[in-house]
Amino acid sequence: MSETVEVKTCDLEGAALDWAVAVIEGYDLMKHPFRRAFIPNFGYCDYSPSTNWTFGGPLIEKHRFEFEWIGSDWHGEPLRLFTACGCDMPADATSAGPTHLIAACRAIVRAKLGETINVPAELIK
C-alpha cells in the first residue's frame, strides 16, 4: 500500500487536488501508470479540473458555484483570491484559491471529504 500524507484541503493544489476531485467524481487516477483516467466522452486523458476548464467548468455548473473576488485584505495588500461556494453544498464548504477552478475544486473536496484528507505521498510536491 502506498504512503499517504495528511493535507489541509485549503492547501491542496496541482496533482493532489486533481486526484481528490477525481476520487469524488469516481475516477481512479492511481490505477493507470501515467495517472490518466477514463472520462466518458473523452477516453483516457489527464484529468486536471483545477487547471483545465474542459473538466473544471462542468463541475462549476454542476454545483452552481458562486464566486467572489477578494482584491485585498484589510491592510490593502493585494490577495488576488477567489472564494467559491456551491449552491448545493454546505455554507461552511466555501474555499479560496488563486483561480476560479482551484477555488471550486477545493470547495468540492472540502464539502465531500472534509477539512483535511489523506493524499498519496507521491502526489505532494
List the predicted regions and their residue ranges.
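Glycine-rich anion-binding surface patch
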Residues: 1-125
